[in-house]
């Protein structure tokens, strides 16, 4: 059922997470931007095209296809290798503590967790930075 729904759903009919468009445009040009996702490649490419942001990303690594799923460190390392960036010089922004923060730490990256109203208690590992909105991603202290 899930596969049939995914195949029929228009993945390009998506909206920006608040602050995402601002963050991408603010970071573009000064930083190399990649994406590490556990999402289906076809769905993810439709979403990026629907938002008109595919050109912001120099590399997109799909966990479960190009490498093991996050939180495994391998998809992060694959993206970094393609970007030519050392882990200690990179930051990963994500909304899943389990996949994004744990994976970023396993790969040696700094982490920014989009809490989006969720409580920040008893998290292991503790994210390097916590933001409530992607509006906060375009500015210091983490860039």
Regions found by a protein language model. Give the residues of each.
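A metal-dependent, Asp-based hydrolase signature
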Residues: 1-5
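Short, acidic loop-to-helix structural element flanking the phosphoryl-transfer center
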Residues: 7-33
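Short, flexible loop segments at the rims of nucleotide/cofactor-binding pockets, characterized by
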Residues: 10-14, 38-39, 68
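Charged, low-complexity surface patches
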Residues: 16, 37, 93
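Asp-based, Mg2+/Mn2+-dependent phosphohydrolase catalytic module
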Residues: 25, 32, 40-41, 45-143
